[in-house]
Regions:
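Sequence/structural signature of beta-propeller domains
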Residues: 1-170
Length: 170
């Protein structure tokens, strides 16, 4: 959840091992909109991830009114809403998120980019995004399961020779 600068881990109980899966994601925005009873202009695909064990595709979506929805796409290419009612989850807030009042050149809040990508390796959740430091491009490493301890954080400092200056948001 970039807006709140928080990472949520949701227990899906999706543990049945699968060898591989193929998905038809052509016009997936239209399929998602139809499943939600609206048009593609009223949904935003936030992220997609494949469960490495079950090979099921999960899609995080936001409706026009800002309501978050989690969908799954099974091997049969059928979209299903993932119920988040009474589900086990854990969360951790990202340290040093961008100031909510600061905006990019298009007027979007920088806080929406506190988490731009995630990966997982050797018990660590790896996060790239922006932070509130002078060189705001950051890379964070968070232990999982979440412990509540501060994550390791590094910022990227790049010198752009064409401009003759450091880039603070790369």
């Amino acid at each position: 959840d970039s807006q709140s600068s928080t990472v949520f881990a949701v227990e899906t109980k999706d543990t049945k091992k699968a060898a591989s899966a193929q998905y038809d994601v052509k016009n997936i925005d239209v399929k998602i909109a139809e499943a939600l009873g609206t048009t593609k202009e009223n949904v935003s695909i936030i992220d997609m991830a494949i469960n490495p064990v079950s090979k099921k595709l999960y899609i995080a979506v936001k409706s026009a009114d800002g309501t978050p929805v989690l969908l799954s796409l099974g091997a049969n290419n059928e979209l299903k809403a993932v119920s988040l009612t009474d589900v086990n989850f854990s969360s951790t807030a990202v340290n040093n998120p961008p100031d909510e009042t600061k905006k990019d050149r298009q007027g979007k809040p920088l806080s929406l980019m506190s988490i731009s990508d995630m990966g997982f390796e050797d018990g660590k959740l790896l996060l790239s995004g922006l932070c509130n430091k002078e060189f705001s491009s950051s890379f964070r490493s968070v232990s999982f399961p979440f412990t509540g301890k501060a994550e390791e954080e590094a910022t990227l400092e790049l010198y752009h020779a064409n401009h003759g200056r450091f880039e603070t948001t790369s």
